[in-house]
């Protein structure tokens, strides 16, 4: 059985725990509303390019890493919700090879 997709907020929560920082403290450091961080941590908000840039600057990571976590999460959610139906309704295109 496949594991549940992991929202990037989960990774952020791990960082905050390791740094022993509260949401309001992180929001202040990142210059964003605390509600944005709360929603990310709860998996109720997608991680945007803006937030990825801020996190990467603060944590010394790359914005691409954070955005890749978001896209992987979205892809796994879509696969769970739509994958089987798509596989049943869309026929793979046949490729022809030149002789």
What are these regions (language model features)?
Residues 17, 28, 57:
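Short polybasic/polar patches that bind polyanions
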């Amino acid at each position: 059985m496949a594991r549940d997709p992991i929202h990037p907020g989960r990774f952020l929560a791990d960082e905050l725990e390791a740094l022993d920082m509260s949401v309001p403290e992180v929001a202040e450091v990142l210059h964003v509303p605390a509600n944005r961080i709360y929603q990310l941590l709860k998996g109720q908000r997608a991680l945007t390019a803006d937030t990825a840039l801020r996190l990467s600057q603060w944590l010394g990571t790359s914005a691409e890493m954070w955005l890749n976590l978001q896209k992987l999460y979205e892809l796994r959610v879509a696969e769970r919700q739509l994958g089987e139906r798509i596989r049943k309704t869309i026929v793979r295109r046949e490729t022809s090879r030149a002789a």
